[in-house]
Amino acid sequence: MLKPSTPAPDFTATLDDGSTFRLADCRGRKNVVLYFYPKDFTPGCTAEACSFRDNYGAIAAYDAIIIGVSGDPADRHAAFRETHALPFPLIADPDGKLRELYDARGWIPWMPPRVTYVIDKEGIIRAAMRHDFRVTAHVPEVLEALARFAPRTGPDAPAATVSG
């Protein structure tokens, strides 16, 4: 896993809707929550994605966007997003290059881990977490990390409703 206080590796990837995402485009504009998960439509991954969905407003209040990454193809991601009303995009990483770039490796080679990075507007990793089995543990830690460095925006910025 990459360590906090280090620069987040830049990348360009295709989102599930076919558009292109460039981490560099977020510099100076948005904080980024980049989370890696094993597979769409599995119980744990669905719970994790829905936890991010249920706290989307609270995370966005810190001027942050959420991006999910797994090895599933874009069409499966699109179906997963639609089925669970996910308000954030997903990146298809079938060859594992992005997972490798972010050192999100599992203890079991065929089982990708759950790793989440909180990246600030300057492209620096501010927090890194891994919880393979506590699937909803990432969101509270993401919110704590964002609260340490990013001011909440707007007078009615929503509070967290941690699910799970």
Residue spans of the language-model regions?
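Chalcogenol-based redox active-site neighborhoods
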Residues: M1-G164
